[in-house]
């Protein structure tokens, strides 16, 4: 008698038909199957993920720069974050002057980047921050040919409307991890509060940017859950961060995710989100180094943050651009959406 299991198509064969041919993302259960694949199948997974991203997103890679308008002093207890005022970390509260913000945007644009995101370490913006943000966005849009995004925490409907009115075309608010794992990561606000902000942003017409950090103690089951939750939002962009343990935070002693596990997660998320921009964000240098970064770019990733992150160092901007050129991956050109 033949082994029945040998007659059943593997998950990658199923994904080739479902995702590559029909453009239908994998379900939570199917994503878990991918995450449980042996390491020997990572190369096959990444090759399929690359085919999917080229077919449904195109060959171009979108480049983005980020800068912190307000660093540190945050009242929340996100256990991965050195900007929390509740932990003993080296980060201190500081505001960036608007002219310096504009200069950062100009430098980012010179790399070929189309996106520039202004970030603030807050639970949500007060009136002072909203006014600073309005001035900053206006100044950048007047002087720099780049799309402006924002990431300033949990919003009210009135704040969503104001950001839309000043020309913020994309809003980042990460869910960070799966709903079931969130209480292990943050206790001062809820996953639901973040989700509500994202729903308002989506309804406003701004593009939704929502991702998280991998390697924060979640199980593979919770990673699959997270992928399904993100897919339900139909975000324009999903930033994929990998935990870079920060001194003084509750996650300071967490192990760095294995590169093979990170690559498998990238491939799985691409198969769950075939039409979404998957962006390399913080932690890739530590988790994947150069070889793994290149493998990710040929395995489902089609966006990058260049330069430094909020509190950690990234790669040299020119080095990333050179890498894209070496891999024959074209940089996405600017398309003003607002």
From Swiss-Prot:
Pathway: Cofactor biosynthesis; biotin biosynthesis; biotin from 7,8-diaminononanoate: step 2/2. Transmembrane segments: none annotated. Its EC number is 2.8.1.6. GO terms for biological process: biotin biosynthetic process. [4Fe-4S] cluster binds at residues 74, 78, 81. It catalyses: (4R,5S)-dethiobiotin + (sulfur carrier)-SH + 2 reduced [2Fe-2S]-[ferredoxin] + 2 S-adenosyl-L-methionine = (sulfur carrier)-H + biotin + 2 5'-deoxyadenosine + 2 L-methionine + 2 oxidized [2Fe-2S]-[ferredoxin]. Binds 1 [4Fe-4S] cluster. The cluster is coordinated with 3 cysteines and an exchangeable S-adenosyl-L-methionine. Residues 59-284 form the Radical SAM core domain. SUPFAM superfamilies: Radical SAM enzymes. InterPro entries: Aldolase_TIM (IPR013785), BATS_dom (IPR010722), Biotin_synth/BioAB (IPR002684), Biotin_synthase (IPR024177), Elp3/MiaA/NifB-like_rSAM (IPR006638), rSAM (IPR007197). [2Fe-2S] cluster binds at residues 117, 209, 279. CDD domains: Radical_SAM. The keyword Transcription regulation does not apply. Catalyzes the conversion of dethiobiotin (DTB) to biotin by the insertion of a sulfur atom into dethiobiotin via a radical-based mechanism. Homodimer. HAMAP family: BioB. This is Biotin synthase.
């Amino acid at each position: 008698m033949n082994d029945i299991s040998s007659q059943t198509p593997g998950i990658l064969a199923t994904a080739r038909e479902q995702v590559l041919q029909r453009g239908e993302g994998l379900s939570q259960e199917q994503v878990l199957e991918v995450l449980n694949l042996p390491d020997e199948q990572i190369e096959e997974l990444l090759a399929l993920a690359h085919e999917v991203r080229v077919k449904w997103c195109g060959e171009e890679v979108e480049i983005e720069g980020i800068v912190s308008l307000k660093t540190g002093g945050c009242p929340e207890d996100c256990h991965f974050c050195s900007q929390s005022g509740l932990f003993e970390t080296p980060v201190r509260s500081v505001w960036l002057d608007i002219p310096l913000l504009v200069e950062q945007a100009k430098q980012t644009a010179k790399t070929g980047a189309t996106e520039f995101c202004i970030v603030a370490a807050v639970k949500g913006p007060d009136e002072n921050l909203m006014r600073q943000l309005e001035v900053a966005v206006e100044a950048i849009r007047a002087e720099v040919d780049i799309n402006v995004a924002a990431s300033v925490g949990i919003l009210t409907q009135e704040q969503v409307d104001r950001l839309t009115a000043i020309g913020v075309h994309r809003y980042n608010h990460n869910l960070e991890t799966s709903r079931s794992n969130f209480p292990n990561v943050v206790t001062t606000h809820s996953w639901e509060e973040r989700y509500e902000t994202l729903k308002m942003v989506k309804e406003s017409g701004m593009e939704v940017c929502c991702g998280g950090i991998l390697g924060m103690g979640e199980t593979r089951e919770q990673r699959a859950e997270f992928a399904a939750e993100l897919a339900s939002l139909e975000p324009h962009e999903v930033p994929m961060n990998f935990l870079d343990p920060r001194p003084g935070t509750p996650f300071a002693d967490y192990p760095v995710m294995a590169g093979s596990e990170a690559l498998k997660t990238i491939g799985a998320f691409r198969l769950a989100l075939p039409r979404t921009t998957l962006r390399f964000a913080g932690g890739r240098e530590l988790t994947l180094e150069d070889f793994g970064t290149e493998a990710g770019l040929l395995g489902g990733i089609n966006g990058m943050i260049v330069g430094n992150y909020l509190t950690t160092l990234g790669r040299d901007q020119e080095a990333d651009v050179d890498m894209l050129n070496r891999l024959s991956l074209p940089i996405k050109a600017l398309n003003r959406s607002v």
